[in-house]
């Protein structure tokens, strides 16, 4: 840990997100048997608040997509936005939503669905990196193919958009073909997206390859934004109508949620998550005019709708939709079962995004001031400030009580806040982690789960033999030490088995955290 960023500018982490407790992150998804630690210990009751009905969502969302398929000629191109396998943002702001809910929903449609992955040739040539995984977009396409096939979903092909001849692109296509994956090419179109007459012609979409598909539901997905998902869908509609198939298009995105208020914290949290893109939630004026009903969409979809609508009219003779909201199929808003739980979770997420922005600004220096200003504005709209969370307040109180040394606070699911200080054996975050496990297992805080005699040789190894400067144990190191102690110490074993109960806890550190 470093104190270079002490004070109010601190890191907020959520354990099932990109988080400093990587070991806890994985442990949370394992099924660990609960071991009794004796009658003298009273374990803290797990009281995670649920605001979203995930089972209802899976059933309602899959059924709604089936209904949309039937509205067309049993052929629907579904533009799939957001993260499919690991939507941790949704799981944080909608407690009860599972990170893989969208994948599970698709699995209910797997006999009808096939996947087409699109990637821009420009991203292949530039070796564009996916920030959350740290891998290039072309490698992420291969990862997605393996992941889809691994759960039984059919991957029909890969489409290279904005195609230009380049050695990197040709090598990528060959690699896919060698793996038995078909590839298709879509080209840059002059005047896109405004010259609608040229786009919807033999010289526009007509130049693109027709992607051969087999199933009623074609899910168009990509490694990241700007890959050309919508353009691919519309190009396919053009070719389908040329072949006499009256196919349809729909858009699946979880956020913003169209049927909750514009300034609902869940929707504000979406703006916070996309502050770098400067997305803005808006009332859909087209929907309001057509139906007299207020719904929420975001600026890019609203701005492009007249163009998309004109394309529909040229392709099909008339547009099936009167508004951007009409194009969507999102049912998440209908599955919120406790609005206040979702509001509170979203408020925390907005502040977390603010701290994340400050951390990135400090670490990389690449964050624009406009992003920070927007996050401050969103906090103000939600009635929040940097001290709105109990963990922030108590982490700084603990730091002040220990002479300004780094401190960490963890809020358990029942609202109890556990703190950890910097000591001679453990860093503040490792200390908070152990203290939280003790609290969950009903173990007195003064109990040593790992003896100093066991920790000191690890410190010697770190500093004398591995070249480390900081002798204090980090989170991963104390968990390994705790695991070793659990073999002979029943209390340590009881604490270890509480790891899954840290899932979703709110954490605040008064300093930036080093990687472990």
Task: List each language-model region with its residue ranges.
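A short, polar/charged loop-to-alpha-helix boundary motif
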Residues: 425-441
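Flexible phosphate-sensing "switch/lid" loops adjacent to ATP/NTP-binding sites
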Residues: 42-220, 236-398, 405, 412-414, ...
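Short HxH-centered metal-ligating active-site micro-motif
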Residues: 439-471
């Amino acid at each position: 840990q470093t104190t270079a960023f002490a004070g109010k500018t601190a890191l907020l982490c959520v354990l099932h997100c990109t988080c400093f407790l990587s070991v806890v992150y994985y442990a949370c998804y394992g099924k660990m048997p609960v071991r009794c630690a004796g009658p003298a210990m009273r374990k803290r009751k797990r009281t995670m608040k649920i605001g979203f009905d995930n089972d209802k969502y899976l059933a309602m969302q899959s059924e709604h997509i089936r209904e949309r398929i039937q509205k067309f000629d049993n052929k629907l191109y579904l533009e799939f936005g957001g993260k499919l396998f690991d939507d941790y943002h949704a799981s944080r702001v909608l407690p009860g939503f599972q990170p893989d809910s969208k994948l599970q929903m698709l699995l209910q449609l797997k006999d009808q669905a096939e996947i087409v992955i699109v990637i821009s040739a420009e991203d292949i040539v530039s070796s564009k990196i996916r920030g959350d995984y740290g891998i290039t977009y072309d490698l992420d396409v291969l990862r997605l193919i393996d992941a889809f096939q691994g759960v039984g979903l059919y991957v029909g092909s890969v489409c290279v958009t904005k195609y230009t001849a380049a050695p990197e692109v040709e090598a990528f296509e060959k690699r896919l073909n060698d793996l038995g994956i078909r590839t298709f090419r879509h080209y840059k179109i002059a005047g896109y997206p405004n010259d609608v007459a040229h786009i919807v012609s033999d010289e526009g979409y007509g130049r693109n390859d027709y992607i051969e598909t087999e199933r009623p539901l074609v899910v168009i997905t990509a490694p990241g934004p700007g890959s050309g998902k919508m353009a691919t869908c519309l190009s396919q509609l053009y070719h389908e109508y040329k072949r006499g198939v009256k196919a349809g298009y729909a858009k699946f995105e979880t956020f913003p949620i169209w049927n909750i208020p514009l300034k609902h914290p869940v929707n504000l949290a979406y703006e916070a998550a996309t502050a770098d893109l400067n997305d803005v939630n808006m009332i859909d004026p087209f929907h309001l005019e057509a139906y007299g009903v207020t719904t929420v969409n975001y600026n890019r979809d609203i701005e492009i709708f007249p163009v998309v609508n004109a394309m529909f009219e040229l392709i099909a003779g008339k547009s099936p939709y009167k508004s951007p909201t009409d194009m969507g199929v999102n049912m998440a808003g209908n599955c919120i079962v406790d609005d206040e739980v979702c509001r509170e979770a979203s408020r925390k997420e907005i502040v977390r995004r603010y701290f994340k922005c400050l951390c990135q600004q400090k670490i990389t220096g690449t964050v624009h001031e406009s992003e920070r200003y927007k996050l401050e504005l969103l906090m103000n709209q939600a009635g929040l400030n940097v001290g709105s969370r109990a963990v922030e307040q108590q982490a700084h109180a603990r730091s002040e009580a220990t002479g300004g040394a780094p401190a960490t606070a963890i809020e358990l699911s029942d609202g109890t806040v556990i703190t950890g200080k910097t000591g001679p054996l453990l860093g503040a975050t490792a200390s908070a982690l152990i203290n939280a496990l003790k609290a969950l297992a009903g173990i007195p805080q003064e109990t040593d789960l790992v003896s100093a005699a066991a920790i000191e040789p690890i410190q010697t190894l770190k500093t004398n033999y591995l070249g480390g400067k900081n002798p204090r144990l980090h989170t991963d190191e104390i968990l390994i030490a705790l695991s070793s102690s659990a073999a002979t110490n029943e209390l340590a074993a009881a604490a270890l088995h509480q790891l899954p109960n840290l899932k979703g806890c709110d954490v605040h550190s008064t300093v930036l955290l080093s990687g472990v």
